[in-house]
């Protein structure tokens, strides 16, 4: 039996400043160690002051994850010695005597299964450790960038209810969608959502794999670790409790250090941060501000757009995709056609090429224009599928690409008849088969498409071939 638990660290990208100081939380493109102050550098005497908007996003997340919300918020010092934390403790939260996380005892429904949420913490992010000449294992020296130090995080801790790598990936994808719909986190930003993965195989101790970047990486790390632990158990090697690192390039886990226990961190309440009261009125206020969540949106999609429950779930799995779908369907009413294109062609190509919806340059009005060309008969569905990747990469409109490539459908009947006659003369065996089995006409249509660079109008081509073969 396999048990898997996750500790998910989510940057509250909605906040413009850090958790306990006024430094900007967005340090993208800034020189190292330039977005700092005495508080986020951990200098003696610097006093942290809570960014109250972090409480708002913590409560919204707790409500969305069906958690019990604490009456007061208490911050703790989590002590450890590591270069990324200059004051030798992290301001976090702990669910123990004298301590209190912002929320606990929640759940996410994953299909028909309940995945329990143990607790949600608000905490600060450590500094970034940079390995200039290799990886954590091979770099000749290490650099520290404190721009990240003090940026606000939510830590979402599950119970060990997950049983497979695929289930863990699905859980993270659903959690990501919830957080995006709440406006808590733009999970498309690199490093905005990471997970520590705890894995135990029957017969062995729990092993933690730290800082795994994406749901797909989590799936791969778990599969590797399960196989490694099972192989060790079969060889009579005892699985020790330890922390491992996910090597993203080699796609393996490697030992990092012996796993600490909770006692090793010596949690105690931070004397510089007084308890923060969370009143019932405050919770009710945020309940009224709750946006539509993915499950609610999926139900609406089924009713409003008559898509299948599966299609609705795929669409809302990524907020940007659901937004794109609704932007298109505001002006183009063939909902099924839009859903099919986005799920089967658009998203498949994005996933195969590691591009996100927000990175795509194909805008809603471009895709509407593409459907209009298709509906008018100027282009075929094959041309649609050829144009879509270029629209995604370049941002060019279908009209621009069609003009550049001369890709409009050929509707000149005399020209089509001439090409079809050539095909019928060259494919005499297929012609005889088509007279007995009309399905073979599709093969002849394909040969015409080949000769015309896929530009022959499909409907006209079928009609002319059938007429010439006496099948109409």
From Swiss-Prot:
Pfam families: GatB_N, GatB_Yqey
UniProt keyword annotations, A-Z: ATP-binding, Ligase, Nucleotide-binding, Protein biosynthesis
E.C. number: 6.3.5.-
InterPro entries for this protein: Asn/Gln-tRNA_amidoTrfase_suB/E (IPR017959), Asn/Gln-tRNA_Trfase_suB/E_cat (IPR006075), Asn/Gln_amidotransferase (IPR018027), Asn/Gln_tRNA_amidoTrase-B-like (IPR003789), GatB (IPR004413), GatB_C_1 (IPR042114), GatB_Yqey_C_2 (IPR023168), Gln-tRNA_amidoTrfase_suB_CS (IPR017958)
Superkingdom of this protein's organism: Archaea
Keyword Protein biosynthesis set for record: yes
Catalytic activity: L-glutamyl-tRNA(Gln) + L-glutamine + ATP + H2O = L-glutaminyl-tRNA(Gln) + L-glutamate + ADP + phosphate + H(+); L-aspartyl-tRNA(Asn) + L-glutamine + ATP + H2O = L-asparaginyl-tRNA(Asn) + L-glutamate + ADP + phosphate + 2 H(+)
GO biological process: glutaminyl-tRNAGln biosynthesis via transamidation; translation
Family statement drawn from the similarity comment of this UniProt entry: Belongs to the GatB/GatE family. GatB subfamily.
Annotated function: Allows the formation of correctly charged Asn-tRNA(Asn) or Gln-tRNA(Gln) through the transamidation of misacylated Asp-tRNA(Asn) or Glu-tRNA(Gln) in organisms which lack either or both of asparaginyl-tRNA or glutaminyl-tRNA synthetases. The reaction takes place in the presence of glutamine and ATP through an activated phospho-Asp-tRNA(Asn) or phospho-Glu-tRNA(Gln).
SUBUNIT field: Heterotrimer of A, B and C subunits.
NCBIfam families the UniProt entry points to: gatB (TIGR00133), PRK05477.1-2 (NF004012), PRK05477.1-4 (NF004014)
Protein name as annotated: Aspartyl/glutamyl-tRNA(Asn/Gln) amidotransferase subunit B
Gene designation: gatB
């Amino acid at each position: 039996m396999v048990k898997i638990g996750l500790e998910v660290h989510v940057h509250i990208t909605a906040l413009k400043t850090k958790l306990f100081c006024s430094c900007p939380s967005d340090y993208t493109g800034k020189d190292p160690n330039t977005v700092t102050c005495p508080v986020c550098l951990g200098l003696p005497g610097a006093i942290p002051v809570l960014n109250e908007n972090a409480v708002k996003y913590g409560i919204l997340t707790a409500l969305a994850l069906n958690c019990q919300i604490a009456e007061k918020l208490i911050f703790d010092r989590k002590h450890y010695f590591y270069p990324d934390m200059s004051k030798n403790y992290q301001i976090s939260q702990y669910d123990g005597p004298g301590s209190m996380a912002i929320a606990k005892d929640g759940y996410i429904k994953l299909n028909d299964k309940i995945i329990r949420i143990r607790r949600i913490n608000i905490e600060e992010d450590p500094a970034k450790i940079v390995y200039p000449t290799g990886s954590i294992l091979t770099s000749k020296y290490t650099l520290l960038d404190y721009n990240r130090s003090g940026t606000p995080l939510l830590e979402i801790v599950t119970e060990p209810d997950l049983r497979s790598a695929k289930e863990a990936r699905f859980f993270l994808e659903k959690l990501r969608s919830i957080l995006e719909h709440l406006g808590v986190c733009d999970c498309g930003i690199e490093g905005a959502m990471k997970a520590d993965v705890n894995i135990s195989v029957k017969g062995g101790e729990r092993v933690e794999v730290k800082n795994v970047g994406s749901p797909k990486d989590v799936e791969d790390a778990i599969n590797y670790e399960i196989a490694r632990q099972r192989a060790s158990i079969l060889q009579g090697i005892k699985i020790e409790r330890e922390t491992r690192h996910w090597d993203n390039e080699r796609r393996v886990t490697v030992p990092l250090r012996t796993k600490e226990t909770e006692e090793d961190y010596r949690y105690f309440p931070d004397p510089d941060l007084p308890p923060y009261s969370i009143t019932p009125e405050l919770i009710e206020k945020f309940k009224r501000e709750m946006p539509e969540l993915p499950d609610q949106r999926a139900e609406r999609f089924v009713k409003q757009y008559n898509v299948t429950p599966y299609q609705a779930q795929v669409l809302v799995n990524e907020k940007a995709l659901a937004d794109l779908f609704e932007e298109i369907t505001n002006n183009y009413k063939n909902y099924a056609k839009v859903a099919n294109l986005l799920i089967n062609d658009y998203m498949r190509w994005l996933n195969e090429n590691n591009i996100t919806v927000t990175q795509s340059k194909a805008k809603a009005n471009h895709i509407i224009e593409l459907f209009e060309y298709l509906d008018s008969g100027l282009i075929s569905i094959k041309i649609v599928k050829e144009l879509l990747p270029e629209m995604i990469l370049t941002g060019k409109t279908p009209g621009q690409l069609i003009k550049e490539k001369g890709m409009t459908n050929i509707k000149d009947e005399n020209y089509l008849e001439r090409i079809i006659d050539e095909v019928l003369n060259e494919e005499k065996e297929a012609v005889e088969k088509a007279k007995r089995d009309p399905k073979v006409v599709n093969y002849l249509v394909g040969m015409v498409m080949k000769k015309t660079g896929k530009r022959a109008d499909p409907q006209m081509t079928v009609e002319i071939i059938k007429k010439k073969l006496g099948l109409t």
